[in-house]
Amino acid sequence: MNWISNYVRPRINSIFSRRETPENLWSKCSECGTMLFHRELSDNLNVCTNCDHHMALTPRDRFTALFDNGIFTQITVPEPLTDPLKFRDQKKYPDRMKAARTATSEAEAMLVAEGEMGRTPIVAAAQDFSFMGGSMGMFVGNAIIAAAERAVALKRPLILFSAAGGARMQEGILSLMQMPRTTVAVQMLKEANLPYIVVLTHPTTGGVTASYAMLGDVHIAEPNALICFAGPRVIEQTIREKLPEGFQRAEYLLDHGMLDRVTHRARMRDELITITRMLMGQTPAVKGELPAPAPLESDAETALASDTDPNGAPPSKD
């Protein structure tokens, strides 16, 4: 009996029992269907290693990749009124907010931070599409205003990463009001002669595209990002025609003069450093090892003295 209980039963249990495996070890590429190991995907900045599809990236992950050594300071954003319209569809608006905060571990759909990028001080803002579709509400409006005011106060450029489905339905006209508010915030930067660079990521649509996302001094997009006001499906149903291949995608907009660059995520930081320093009138960033410093005058005199004999005669050329 002891042999059965001590050896056979544990052996059977070990064979038939399922190991508990974390659910987030693997991710499936939505473009090509390849299963990607989470660490491999994270090291590649959430870009598929098979088809180069750019997946969503959280604001904190973007800032970690953007700022020097991943170090940044989050800027506090004023909190707006909670559920001012008492909106309810299938769920109450506060319940949707609570679910989004639980799922993302973030307070709202935009994060604002400051730090250094290539030794250049900047202010950055990024939208989180996983938080209610990155929708533009009163908080997002407050965040952009806070970012612009901080940039003006410190005389720093502002870099914004957009990712949104448009205005937040649950806030109604108060959400649409953020379009002129954010436009005024961008104008503050222009009056202060500070660069405003927008990186459009997939997707950037609706009222976000119609306001602050297309008001930058430079517009850069990630590959194959959908950038539009009304989506292609809505347009096709309205005009009853099939749209061209790649319509409203980043490459299409670049060909038609709506964008300045389409840049791979892996090269985005270097691109932003170059453009930011150029617009700020700074010298190009030094890449690689810095050159050895020039010798000081006292060092040069010491070196000359070591090459001279005790009688003061110059060294022999033999």
Swiss-Prot record:
Binds 1 zinc ion per subunit. Pfam families: Carboxyl_trans, Zn_ribbon_ACC. The keyword Hydrolase does not apply. Pathway: Lipid metabolism; malonyl-CoA biosynthesis; malonyl-CoA from acetyl-CoA: step 1/1. GO terms for biological process: fatty acid biosynthetic process; malonyl-CoA biosynthetic process. Keywords: ATP-binding, Cytoplasm, Fatty acid biosynthesis, Fatty acid metabolism, Lipid biosynthesis, Lipid metabolism, Metal-binding, Nucleotide-binding, Transferase, Zinc, Zinc-finger. This is Acetyl-coenzyme A carboxylase carboxyl transferase subunit beta. Component of the acetyl coenzyme A carboxylase (ACC) complex. Biotin carboxylase (BC) catalyzes the carboxylation of biotin on its carrier protein (BCCP) and then the CO(2) group is transferred by the transcarboxylase to acetyl-CoA to form malonyl-CoA. Acetyl-CoA carboxylase is a heterohexamer composed of biotin carboxyl carrier protein (AccB), biotin carboxylase (AccC) and two subunits each of ACCase subunit alpha (AccA) and ACCase subunit beta (AccD). The keyword Metal-binding applies. A zinc finger (C4-type) spans 29-51. Zn(2+) binds at residues 29, 32, 48, 51. The lineage of its organism: Bacteria, Pseudomonadati, Pseudomonadota, Alphaproteobacteria, Rhodobacterales. It is an enzyme of class 2 (transferase). InterPro entries: AcCoA_carboxyl_beta, Acetyl_CoA_COase_Trfase_b_su, ClpP/crotonase-like_dom_sf, COA_CT_N, Znf-ACC.
